[in-house]
From Swiss-Prot:
SUPFAM superfamilies: Ribosomal protein L30p/L7e (SSF55129). Belongs to the universal ribosomal protein uL30 family. This is Large ribosomal subunit protein uL30. One of its GO terms (biological process) is translation. The gene is rpmD.
Amino acid sequence: MAQIKITLTKSPIGRIPAQRKTVVALGLGKLNSSVIKEDNAAIRGMVNAVSHLVTVEDVK
């Protein structure tokens, strides 16, 4: 499967608790931290929920 790189670019401080939990569930902690995840519907849904806080890149 394809993979995506997710980078936390904005702080979740002051966001609603569900968005903060989504950031943690994606494995992101500090600003500019990145994780590589499988590109599937579940991960895409989580990314869409916090799209204003993260950037997404395709990994080859």
